Amino acid sequence: MEEPLQFGDGGRLFGILTLPSRSHRKAPGLPVFVFLNAGLLHRVGPRRLYVHLARDLSRMGFSSLRVDLAGKGDSPPRPGLTNQQSVAADYDEILRVLESRLARVPLILAGLCSGADNAIRLAPKDSRVVGLVLLDPVCSPDDGFSARAFVSKYTNTARYVAWLKRRFEAPTTQPRGSQEQIDPLTLRDAPTLEQLRDAPLEQLRSAFESIRERDGRVLSVFTQYALQYYNQAGQLARVLGVAGYQQFCTELFWPQAEHTYTLELHRRRLIDAIKTWAGGFIRSRIDVTRNIGTD
């Protein structure tokens, strides 16, 4: 079931609340997914990714809220506030509307690119957040990053094939201007290596440690967009150095997938990965319920 919500001060925020039917409620106390905007994209996500995710998750028993943050989609901007201040104010309104509709519930914050950045900033401050789905979050390079990047650049046969095609093939087709185009750079300015090396890890580490302390879970997925700063599965774990990382974190590296999951194959793979990851919360809640029943 999907319900449009207009909420917040003066009804300035707009979102879609997706609820599972009674037949799909598999475990009590499941966390609610909150999908955060990425850059200029509104609540549907790139190529309706968040819509499909919300509906698939509802069939697993999860509720979710897809919301237009201020200045995106159908929500007007908050004049006089910085982006971080505006996101913080929006988040307070999100918490209030969820509490009024679903009571005080645990949350999973999910976002692509700048949406992941916002989730990382918000998680340590809110004890309700027990899960993070981070799509192409920022990650500092580790000691082996530059060497791996060098080897990959000069051993990538696709690079030479593409050069030969450009060199010898005359253009035979017109650009397909009618197709939907989403420029990843409108979602977040790609950080330089210098910025990444200088960026403190405290905020990112704090987000992961807060989830660990709440017995939660984190899913991080990196695509070809992240090759500018991430090029090997496990790099995030090494950079963070968070105790017990493997026990509560899933880290995936899909260098063939585009940042906005242009191909249906890659979108389906991502949705399946998130559903598999989310299933861990169902198993945990069922175990808790059984333990309570046997006490």
Please annotate each region the language model reported:
Residues R48-P76:
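Conserved alpha/beta-hydrolase
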Residues K72-L102:
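Catalytic nucleophile-loop/oxyanion-hole region of alpha/beta-hydrolase
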Residues L40, L69-G73, C139, E258:
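Alpha/beta-hydrolase active-site loop signature
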Residues D92-N156, S210:
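Primarily recognizes the serine-hydrolase "nucleophile elbow" in alpha/beta-hydrolase
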